[in-house]
Amino acid sequence: KSRSRGLGDVYKRQYYGFGIVSNNEIDKINILNASLLAMKRAILNLPIKPALVLVDGIYKPDLNIPMKTIIGGDSIEDAISAASIIAKVYRDNLMIEYNKKYPDYNFKKNKGYGTKEHFFAIQQKGICTIHRKSFKGVLNK
């Protein structure tokens, strides 16, 4: 809730795009490549072509757009910080929706992260269709 409170002005004053990658895509191409694919999709979903894209970390997606990688960028650049918050709020809301379909996993509370409770639910119920089969906590469950 506190993350999403301050987003009103960001949504009004900034351009943003979302890049969604499914759990099946992550399983096929690995988490790093999936992150780069999500970034690429988000950039391509922008309503404008950016003059420069700031990227948190050392890796950048393969696009013909000027980019600058910044290690720890979410704590240095306001634009990266805002993008990180927007992405987290979007994902949290998505997990709340998934909780309605898969209540046994309590996604509303754990947001899909590997909590003890979440792993216990996987042990008891098995995985559901949104779990990443390549995640070490899910392997052999």
Which stretches of residues belong to each language-model region?
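Single conserved hydrophobic/aromatic residue that forms the stacking wall/gate
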Residues: 1-11
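Structural signal for conserved beta-strand scaffold positions within catalytic alpha/beta enzyme cores
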Residues: 18-20, 69-71, 109
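Catalytic beta-strand/loop module used to bind and position nucleotide/cofactor moieties
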Residues: 30-37, 52-78
